[in-house]
Amino acid sequence: MLVENSEPEASTPTQPEAAPPSSPRPSAPARPDKVCGWEPFSLVVDELWPLLKRHYHELGAYEAAPLDPDWDRYFEYERCGILRIWTMRSEGVLIGYVVCQVVHGLHSRNTKYCFGDLFWLAPEWRDGLSGMRMLRGVLKALKDMGVHIVRWETNDTFEPDATGRSRVAALLSRLGFKPIGTVLQKVLTHE
């Protein structure tokens, strides 16, 4: 059930016994054009799984961390009100998503943060302004929820532009995001 510009409805999530099905199926009535809004994780997990696999394989930069979702934690974060899923649909079919975590700061308890985790739009929908529309909708909805600061880490090895930034980083910059530091990573091998 797609609920535009509102928080997810309380639900009693059930964890899938195995990985969700491998093919998407609409869970919302067919709608004209593209529709965006918050959806509860527990209601979109079956559709989300095949898109997560496409997203992961498209990035191809995570040999040290194979795709193996911690479904228990996803469901727990949903129950706690931390996990937010913003979806984009065309005629009821899931074509993109933003996954984020909304929490109060540990160093500033009155400051509400959103940490962007995943942003993906099916390649066949990337022409035009669909990605920009998705992110603008997310930012407006987060502001309406009282979020003060949105942070996003991007993978600059994915579709870099002439400056070395990813397409996502360039898109976020156009929406007013500013660099605040550098993310450094070291993979520790456990032989």
Predicted regions and their residues:
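A short, internal acetyl-CoA/4′-phosphopantetheine-binding micro-motif in the GNAT/acyltransferase core
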Residues: 117-128
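A conserved beta-strand-loop-helix scaffold within acyl/acetyltransferase catalytic domains
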Residues: 61-85, 90, 98-109
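Conserved GNAT acetyl-CoA-binding A-motif
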Residues: 144-156
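Conserved active-site alpha-helix within GNAT-family acetyltransferase domains
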Residues: 156-182
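Conserved acetyl-CoA-binding loop-helix of GNAT-fold acetyltransferases
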Residues: 127-140
